[in-house]
Amino acid sequence: MIEYEDFEKVEIRVGTVIEARLNDKSIRPSIILIIDFGEVLGNKKTSAQLTKYYKPEELIGKQVAAVTNFPPKQIGKMISEVLVLGFPDEENNPILVMPTKKVNNGGKLF
């Protein structure tokens, strides 16, 4: 079991996708995302294997949840700055975590 203090260390914040494009340099099909986390963090870049259910142009303007306080991680030829969150379907394809109503970019999950 983790303690509540452990949960508090993880920053899960919401941001709006402002750019999305296919990552044609990745081994597995993925989408590069630029996410606006507002004044709190600004814009952050990541890559996620979302092509089963999402087209890049459909993601623009959508709000997504991401872990924002992991250190940057090399993913192929790019550096990922955040980890976008999702739940797996029956085949382990990610379904994004998104708020059902618009919220302020940078808002922290509690």
What are these regions, as identified by a protein language model?
Residues 1-110:
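Phosphate-backbone binding interfaces of nucleic-acid-interacting proteins
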